[in-house]
Amino acid sequence: MTFTRPTPRDDLIYLTEGGFEPELLYLHGIDLPCFAAFAILSNPAKRAIFRGIYERVCDVAAAEGTGLLLGWIGYRASPDWGGKLGLSPDGLKEATLAGIEFLEELRRAY
């Protein structure tokens, strides 16, 4: 996996997401143990819902011609929180890589 860090442009307005967890919880009824949204990526149905949420933001940025900065939902993907979720260090690594691939898929699509 190659990582490139784009340089923000001074002449471009950027849209950012403001956190999707409340929508997952309250509109879709998805339980987020320890408020760890990254854990839902292993469930295909929940992943599809999550992708739809992200795609809406991507669609707005594309339609408005703005840049887009997406954060990853893995701020809880640490050994402490992973342990509370029953993840081994290898399981946590897999979840982290799955989250990165999730954002890479979106980047390629847009």
Language model feature labels by segment:
Residues 1-110:
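Domain-level signal for soluble alpha/beta catalytic cores
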